[in-house]
């Protein structure tokens, strides 16, 4: 899979790669899940929500204070180390480019308060209507069909953020899109990859962000996978 991400040679193949990654549980430009339709509780519907960032909150990209600045510095260093562990060159510069992309995305994301507002977040669209959230790089109807041919309508939690993210990704260089996908893949699959990758992923997300000093012992992690 990692070789497939590295081999992407045009933006035309990006949408399909995003769908394939999502099916593997790897975070992409948007999140999605199947849940109850709040206005028709007997129905289930696919919901799309804003995504595209590696830090868990938009404020971590945007707030100007020492704590957030420290997190941003640590995050870029983490991305650089992950790229280097994947055998990639120029990790620092490429990590900075991914950080710049994600900062642009954070600027169009909804605040935590708005994103959790059930009324603002209920926006239903037919499959055909989701074309308005597409860009030349991301074909939303095609992606939804690839996720499931049964999808005929969806809820989009933060429409302006989803469209804004699609537009930002369309303007981004292919190399940056690939690097971001590679990094999301390394993080999402970290526990199946060499310990050096898993340890680095935990050092940032577990220790730096959450304060957990160390990973569980190997036997405990193994039990968790059974």
Task: Specify the residue positions occupied by each region the protein language model found.
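Noncatalytic, helix-rich "gating/capping" subdomain that lines the substrate-entry/channel surface
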Residues: 1-226
């Amino acid at each position: 899979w990692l070789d497939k991400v590295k081999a992407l040679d045009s933006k035309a193949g990006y949408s399909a790669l995003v769908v394939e990654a999502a099916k593997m549980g790897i975070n992409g430009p948007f999140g999605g899940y199947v849940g109850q339709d709040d206005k028709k509780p007997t129905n289930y519907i696919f919901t799309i929500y804003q995504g595209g960032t590696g830090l868990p909150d938009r404020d971590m990209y945007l707030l100007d204070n020492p704590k957030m600045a420290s997190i941003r510095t640590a995050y870029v260093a983490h991305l650089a180390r992950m790229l280097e562990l994947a055998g990639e060159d120029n990790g620092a510069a490429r990590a900075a480019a991914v950080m710049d992309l994600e900062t642009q995305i954070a600027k169009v994301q909804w605040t935590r308060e708005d994103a959790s507002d059930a009324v603002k977040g209920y926006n239903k669209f037919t499959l055909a209507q989701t074309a308005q959230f597409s860009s030349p790089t991301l074909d939303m109807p095609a992606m939804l069909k690839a996720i499931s041919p049964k999808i005929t309508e969806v809820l989009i939690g933060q429409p302006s953020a989803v469209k804004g993210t699609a537009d930002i990704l369309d303007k981004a260089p292919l190399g940056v899109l690939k690097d971001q996908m590679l990094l999301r893949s390394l993080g999402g699959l970290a526990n199946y990859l060499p310990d050096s990758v898993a340890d680095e992923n935990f050092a940032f997300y577990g220790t730096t962000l959450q304060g957990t000093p160390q990973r569980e012992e190997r036997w405990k992690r193994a039990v968790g996978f059974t």
